[in-house]
Amino acid sequence: MNAREVALNILNEVYTQQAYANISLSRHLQKNQLSDQDRRFITELVYGTVKAGDTLLWILKKFVNRPLNKIEPTIINILRLGIYQIVFMDKIPESAACNEAVNLAKKYSNQGSAKFVNGVLRNLIRQPEKYAMPTGNKASELAIREQHPLWLVKKFIHTFGSEAAIKLCQFNNTNAPLVLRTNNFKNNTTRINH
């Protein structure tokens, strides 16, 4: 099972069985024999896709002519993974993201679904202007642009105002600094410095 397939299985559990992403991720990482690189990649795919969930669906709706509830949940999750890689992961070649998504659709659905996934993702690659992030300061636009739940953005705006809400959302999207803490009962300063 490759990294994207593991990520898909986790997303299927999260979105169809209401599993917690962190618990499902831990279980799958322990269950599968994976390299450290694959483990990091799966973690980024799962957490990134879940975090950007509303934004990914907003983008998907721009390229699909039917209601999303008429599409198999697994295909929606394959498209979420593909869109996340194409839009938010700069180091992943767009063609690789598209081809791997098509392969997953063939394996987990049928040839028609694979063609559908291919068409959606190829159009996404060809027409990036179609999913340009909204630039306004309305709650719904800010939620899409900054990948935050709408209810949280509304609460930020109500509590702190629009400008502070934007800064809060942007701050939430930064990586936390690495902080190391030692247990002074088990280690001494000399040992830690080496």
Where are these regions (language model features)?
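Class I Rossmann-like S-adenosyl-L-methionine
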Residues: 1-194
